[in-house]
Amino acid sequence: MSAEGDSGPGRREVAYRLFAAEFDDASLSYSESDEERAPNYVVTPTGLRVNRLFAVGVATEVESINDDTLRGRIVDPTGAFVTYAGQYQPEAQAFLDRTTPPAFVAITGKARTFEPEDSDRVFTSVRPESLSEVDADTRDRWVVSAAEATLHRIAVCAAALDSPLRGEELRTALSESGVDDSLAAGVPRALDHYGTTTAYLEGLRQLAVDALELVADEREEVRPLDLEPGEGGDAALGPLPAVDVDLDSAAETSPTIEPEAEPPADSAAEPESEP
């Protein structure tokens, strides 16, 4: 997997790996500035701040929405990525047009969210930059790398949940602990927006482990993630990779506002002296 981190002006954003189930739960998007070319980010419940993503799965459906646009569904072991290709994505449109499902497909593209005017649900999609046909081995390798990345994010997010730090203080502490800038920026936003619970993190952890077992032929299917990010409350987390994230020290050194000292009772009752 490519190194993670922020991309400065003129630099291409990293294409992250994540499962469709988590991407489908995403409902937060924002831009760092009002500049026309400022990147737009989608923040997932574990705090992944993603502008571009890379996914591999099975194209199960291609359909025409109108005269100019095709919609494709690319399914991984946990759910489906939806992609739209129109006149401004001619190569992707041509690829979808000639693809006969089912077919193993890799997609790199921009993460997007959309909320219809008559709905309170936020839908996610991928605006394709590139599409290519791949094989089952490529899909399996992607599943392993996506699972590893997911488990790492869960471990970082769990450490953040255990800390009293929030907002900019949490972002700074995560960055100083060596967490990549993108995840450090996303985790505080995720906790604030979704109220991500340890029960959700445990469900996502089980999903990632199921995906690994599926690739290893130890399981026939991945159990669904039934919880919303803010549901379920506290839960014990199963095994996670070790992450060197020390937020306790940052919390101890975080400045606190001391209450102003009350004046002594006697002096408070004394009238002010005359000039």
Regions found by a protein language model. Give the residues of each.
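Intrinsically disordered, compositionally biased tail regions
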Residues: T253-P275
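Flexible glycine-rich surface loops and low-complexity tracts that mediate binding to linear polymers
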Residues: G57, P102-E117
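Short, conserved beta-turn/loop elements at beta-strand boundaries and strand-helix junctions
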Residues: V62-D67, P116, A136
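Short, glycine/small-residue-enriched coil/turn segments at secondary-structure junctions
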Residues: V43-L53
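Short nucleic-acid-contacting surface segments enriched for D/E, G, S/T with interspersed K/R
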Residues: Q89-T108
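Extended, charge-rich, solvent-exposed interface segments
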Residues: R98-F104, E117-E220
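OB/S1-fold single-stranded nucleic-acid-binding modules
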Residues: M1-V42, E202-A251, P271
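OB-fold (S1/OB) nucleic-acid-binding surfaces
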Residues: L48, V58, S64-Q89
